């Protein structure tokens, strides 16, 4: 594998953290002085389970709304954070609809997101780690958020303060109608994904006032690596029944395993045990993207309770880089059809000018090999104005389309959810 967080921000008024641009994506970054990032223990965040369930539900909507003839990689947690940032500036019915999708309202919503993100803080690291030849010895989960404001737009100071306090988001100003503004967005995306995603999906527009950006990057070794000698070309059956050959890893050892309603699943922890990957194989002929949030929840619960069994596991290596996902149909399906500029949302907490969502995208990548996993995603919302072991008796062969979910061990928050229909690379 070419090797390929939560940023605490102690930030009243807006003050510059860096003065000159150059090539630094943080240049020109601003944050609110005197603001301390919200710190909430998991035990006191009463709405955390409902936010996790809502994230799982949104992830299944993302899978279902993506093109049905290709691989899908999503980060439902990243979209939820971006929507949480948008909710800080929403009012009235718009806020109510956002909070229905987010799974919690008011202070409970803020506390849940702070607690969820806080569980990942200790795994933060330099996103450039993915450019090295080897995966890091301990997992890196890097989270970052920012708001880019058009340099002619009077954004509400209270809104920027809320984003800094609740999400650690810094602020940059740029001409969002120009290529210069695009370069600011691109540089931030490239930096916080270690170059895995090199450009923003947002397009310059004279009506664009604010862009919200959320990034997540993961680089983690398997707790027990696959043996390189066990990888070989093996058969994989595509959705249409075509059989192809793809590089497939093999393992025969004790692995946590469960079966739910005909779906078979294995859980592979990463080093340290704070995050894991659930590999989920649907019944033959069933599209993995047809999974329901209820079934995902049942599978997760079953794996939580399951004991390791001696299992022969065959899993394709992956190098998946889908096209950017347009989030408008996803969010409309999820219940947010009235955020857009052909409706009349209330985003007056962000600032004046009859604001509405004009662009929303997610880009994500997923790489899996014998050593571990690298994944990254960026969600952007543009707001416009106007000794030979015993032979296992049980075998789980991922030789047809399947799901892969990466989640926090402590909270089960789904960080990445992918439907693999063709693992060739």
Predicted regions and their residues:
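Detector for small/aliphatic-rich hydrophobic stretches
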Residues: 2-175
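Primarily extracytoplasmic ectodomains and periplasmic/lumenal surface modules that are beta-strand-rich
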Residues: 90-94, 155, 219-223, 275, ...
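Extracytoplasmic/secreted cell-surface and envelope-processing proteins
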Residues: 94-98, 286-289, 322-324, 376, ...
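Short Gly/aromatic-enriched secondary-structure transition segments
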Residues: 98-103, 226-235, 289-298
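Non-catalytic, conformational "gating/processing" segments within enzyme and secreted inhibitor domains
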Residues: 111, 116-278, 308-387
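Internal alpha/beta scaffold segment
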Residues: 275, 282-307
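C-terminal soluble interaction/assembly domains
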Residues: 359-425
């Amino acid at each position: 594998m070419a090797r390929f967080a939560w940023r605490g921000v102690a930030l009243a008024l807006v003050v510059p953290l860096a003065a000159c641009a150059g090539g630094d994506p943080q240049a020109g970054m601003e944050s609110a002085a005197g603001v301390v990032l919200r710190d909430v223990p998991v035990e006191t965040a009463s709405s955390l389970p409902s936010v996790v369930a809502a994230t799982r539900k949104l992830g299944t909507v993302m899978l279902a709304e993506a093109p049905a003839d290709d691989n899908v990689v999503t980060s439902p947690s990243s979209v939820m954070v971006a929507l949480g940032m948008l909710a800080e500036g929403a009012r009235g019915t718009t806020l109510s609809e956002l909070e229905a999708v987010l799974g919690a309202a008011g202070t409970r919503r803020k506390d849940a997101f702070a607690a969820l993100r806080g569980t990942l803080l200790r795994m933060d690291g330099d996103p450039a780690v993915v450019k090295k030849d080897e995966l890091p010895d301990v997992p890196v989960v890097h989270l970052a958020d920012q708001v880019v404001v058009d340099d002619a737009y009077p954004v509400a100071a209270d809104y920027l303060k809320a984003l800094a306090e609740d999400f650690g988001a810094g602020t940059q100003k740029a001409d969002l109608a120009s290529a210069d503004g695009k370069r600011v967005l691109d540089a931030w995306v490239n930096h916080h994904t270690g170059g895995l995603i090199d450009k923003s999906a947002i397009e310059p527009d004279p009506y664009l006032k604010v862009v919200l950006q959320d990034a997540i990057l993961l680089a983690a070794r398997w707790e027990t690596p696959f043996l390189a000698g066990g990888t070989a070309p093996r058969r994989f059956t595509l959705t249409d029944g075509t059989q192809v050959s793809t590089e497939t890893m093999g393992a025969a050892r004790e692995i946590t395993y469960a079966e739910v309603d005909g779906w078979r699943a294995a859980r592979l922890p990463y080093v340290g045990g704070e995050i894991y990957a659930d590999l989920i194989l649907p019944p033959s002929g069933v599209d993995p993207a047809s999974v329901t949030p209820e079934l995902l929840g049942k599978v997760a619960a079953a794996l939580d309770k399951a004991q390791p069994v001696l299992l022969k596991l065959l899993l394709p290596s992956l190098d998946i880089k889908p096209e950017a996902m347009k989030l408008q149909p996803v969010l409309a399906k999820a219940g947010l059809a009235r955020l857009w500029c052909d409706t009349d949302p209330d985003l007056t907490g962000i600032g004046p000018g009859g604001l509405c969502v004009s662009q929303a995208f997610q880009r994500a990548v997923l790489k899996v090999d014998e050593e571990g996993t690298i994944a990254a995603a960026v969600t952007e919302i543009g707001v416009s104005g106007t000794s030979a072991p015993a032979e296992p008796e049980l075998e789980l062969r991922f030789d047809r389309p399947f799901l892969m979910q990466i989640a926090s061990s402590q909270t089960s928050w789904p960080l990445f959810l992918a439907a693999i229909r063709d693992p060739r690379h």
